[in-house]
Amino acid sequence: MSVQDKQGQNINVGDTVYTPYRGGKHEGQVADIVTTKEEAAEKGVKNPPKVLFTDQNNKDVAHNPGTLTDLDKQK
């Protein structure tokens, strides 16, 4: 199953993604994409699909794909 960002571009592992968040931003390289409830339970996230990445502050984050912008597809 593929997931798309808010512009409808496919998000792949290794892509750089961005989302505004609480007056700042989360930006990082996609480490994993969770699409099933089983994967979500294994990775400790809820309500798949989720895109997992480490942001610029080395914090592990999980976001809904529709909230993200794939910066690699913007170039």
UniProtKB/Swiss-Prot annotation:
Disruption phenotype: Leads to abnormal metabolite levels including decreased levels of 2-ketoglutarate and increased levels of phosphoenolpyruvate. When in the presence of NADPH, increases virulence in a macrophage infection model. InterPro entries: Hva1_TUDOR. Gene3D superfamilies: 2.30.30.1060. Induction: Repressed in models of infection. It comes from Cryptococcus neoformans var. grubii serotype A (strain H99 / ATCC 208821 / CBS 10515 / FGSC 9487). May play a role in primary metabolism. This is Putative primary metabolism protein HVA1. Pfam families: Hva1_TUDOR (PF11160). Residues 1-24, 40-75 are annotated as: Disordered. Signal peptide: none annotated. The gene is HVA1. Disulfide bonds: none annotated. Residues 1-13 have a biased composition (Polar residues).
